[in-house]
Design a protein with these regions (language model features):
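Sec-dependent N-terminal signal peptides
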Residues: 1-3
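N-terminal soluble domains immediately following signal/targeting peptides that reside
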Residues: 9-183, 193-195
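Alpha-helical transmembrane segments
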Residues: 189-200
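Cytoplasmic C-terminal tails of single-pass
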Residues: 202-206
């Protein structure tokens, strides 16, 4: 689930190439779900770019080549250090669906991030793919575990750039029970023992 969605992915203009990025931050990696949906008026240009042999079918080599082009236009940094993104999965619609403005390219990207200490961190995501005809959306996803907490998100007006401030906690901090409930529980236990002792004393006296 996205923490804050700026607009509806389904509502895009026919003359735009809608690119929606959802970014998941985990302690040792960053996952990016990138959905690319060309409107009907720009789809023919995109199909021509992907279908290099003009046979009306988006072949495996052609989709791999286009995915590589997208990857070159996308950037990721953590604490001002560039991170290498790799392709986990890619799904391409049929040509007919794309020409009707109904086809979405789904890309799953991931970067391994190592050596991060507990504390504050900043992620920067950049998307410069087909900037001349594109509309962009970018949002952080709710982290899967308790070790990562997203604090703020900042976007440029076009949403080609997204900065995410987040906090990374130690695994021990995540596992350690909160101090306040522990103290309250101890006080309650002592109070109960004192009450039972007083009750037994009263019975003995009676």
């Amino acid at each position: 689930m996205a923490i804050s969605a700026a607009a509806s992915v389904s509502a895009h203009r026919l003359d735009e190439y809608l690119q929606a990025a959802r970014i998941g931050i985990e302690p040792d990696r960053v996952d990016i779900e990138l959905d690319l949906t060309p409107g009907a008026d720009v789809a023919r240009r995109l199909v021509s770019e992907i279908d290099r042999n003009r046979d009306g079918v988006l072949g495996r080599d052609e989709t791999r080549a286009y995915t590589a082009n997208v990857l070159r236009d996308v950037g990721l940094q953590v604490d001002d250090r560039p991170q290498a993104l790799g392709v986990i999965d890619s799904q391409f619609p049929g040509v007919d669906a794309m020409l009707k403005g109904e086809g979405t390219i789904h890309l799953r990207l991931s970067a391994r991030v190592s050596g991060l200490a507990a504390g504050d961190h900043r992620l920067l995501f950049l998307n410069a793919h087909h900037a001349d005809v594109s509309a962009y959306l970018a949002n952080a996803l709710v982290p899967e575990g308790a070790r990562v907490e997203v604090i703020t998100q900042r976007r440029d007006p076009a949403q080609r750039q997204l900065e995410i401030d987040y906090v990374l906690r130690n695994a021990a901090d995540r596992a350690r029970p909160p101090l306040a409930p522990t103290i309250i529980g101890a006080i309650a236990l002592l109070a109960g023992l004192a009450w039972m002792s007083k009750r037994e004393t009263s019975r003995s006296a009676g």
